Amino acid sequence: MPKQHKLTPLEETLEAWRGAREGVIEEAENVPASKYGFRPTPRSRTVAELLRHILEVGMMAAGELSRKDTDLHRAPWPELLALYTAPLAKATNRAAILRLLRSSIGDAQRKLRRPASGR
């Protein structure tokens, strides 16, 4: 007999997202601050750029999915990201990026748990 899930699909998604974020944080903590500017190839992102990219996509997803009028095509991708990524302006070093990785997942979960009528 299949195992019954006690979580709603939303809660399962948020739990998986938190687990994935915790893994990213653990890996980011393993990288010394002096290596956050490391770029493996000229066409690659630095460690800091990659982590900031993870943050910006998460912020945009939470922002758009918590809107009453969600529409991922309402603006070109860079413009859509810019609507939600103001907190990234201050995340320019390892400590700030790690703080934002830790705090933004909770912010996203709170947004997505709000009833649709409160969005």
What spans do the regions from the language model cover?
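Short, helix-capping/interhelical loops that line the mouth of catalytic, cofactor-
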Residues: M1-T13, E56-R119
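Mature N-terminal segment immediately following signal peptide/propeptide cleavage
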Residues: L14-A33
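Short, well-ordered coil loops that connect the C-terminus of an alpha-helix to the N-terminus
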Residues: A33-S34, R114
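Surface-exposed patches in mature extracellular/periplasmic domains of secreted proteins
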Residues: Y36-R39
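Conserved functional hotspot residues or short segments at active or partner-binding sites
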Residues: R43
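Helix-turn-helix
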Residues: V47
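Histidine-centered divalent metal-coordination motifs
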Residues: H53
